[in-house]
């Protein structure tokens, strides 16, 4: 009776690894030719979960993570400082444990530039231009 349970656990773990690996590799947003520094930062660090247009990504859902849809007009409720803090220190201190911290890999200037880019995604969504 113990062997079937172990086999089931091994199979489920294997399927999880395969599914997770494929989700990570497939449809990963790539910066277009001539992309700005901030576009490369966003697409390289944020788009995997938040989507290239800030509307969320199916990849995050596979891991049962519900990242914020940055392009939604309702996201405008957060201040620039809140966004800076969550990008720099991660979401755990602010009640968003799925959000990783980027303070060790990004300068404060890069984080500020990224925050401005993210805020612009929200403005474009509010005006109906996101994704166009």
Where are these regions (language model features)?
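N-terminal Sec-pathway targeting helices
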Residues: 1-12
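Charged catalytic carboxylate motif
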Residues: 41, 82, 110-113
């Amino acid at each position: 009776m113990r062997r079937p349970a172990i086999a089931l656990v091994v199979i489920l773990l294997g399927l999880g690894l395969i599914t997770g690996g494929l989700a990570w590799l497939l449809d990963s947003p790539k910066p277009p030719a001539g992309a700005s520094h901030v576009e490369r930062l966003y697409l390289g660090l944020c788009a995997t979960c938040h989507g290239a247009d800030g509307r969320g990504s199916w990849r995050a859902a596979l891991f049962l993570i519900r990242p914020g849809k940055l392009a939604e007009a309702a996201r405008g409720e957060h201040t620039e400082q809140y966004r800076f803090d969550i990008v720099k220190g991660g979401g755990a201190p602010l009640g968003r444990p799925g959000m990783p911290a980027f303070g060790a890999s990004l300068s404060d200037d890069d984080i500020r530039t990224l925050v401005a880019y993210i805020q612009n995604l929200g403005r474009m969504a509010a005006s109906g231009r996101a994704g166009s």
